[in-house]
Amino acid sequence: MTPVDEYIERLENLHQQHLIFNLHRLLMSFQGVSTRLRFKIPFYDSKKWICYINPIKKNGVEVCFIKGFQLTNKPQLEARKRTMVKGISIYEINDETLSLIAEVFQEALELDKNS
């Protein structure tokens, strides 16, 4: 079991555990992606850091993209007073949410490969 798998398993909030588990599975399905715990949360990278999943209040998580300001302007990407990072807050997992995250992650991967 990897440190990220252990992190997910140890989460006390079962709803956040469910969200992160499904997002982790989705992100790890992309070729050339690896994961590692940094700052006590899961980070996903290829050549460089691409994104991380951060538990937030109200039973949600935020998928934060390191180079969020360079991504196509999607209304779901929120800056929250950050200069580089943009994130998408998630409170429920469904096909629409997974499709959105996959689309943004694919764009972030392409940006990473071309940098």
Locate each region found by the language model.
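Charge-dense, helix-prone N-terminal extensions
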Residues: 1-115
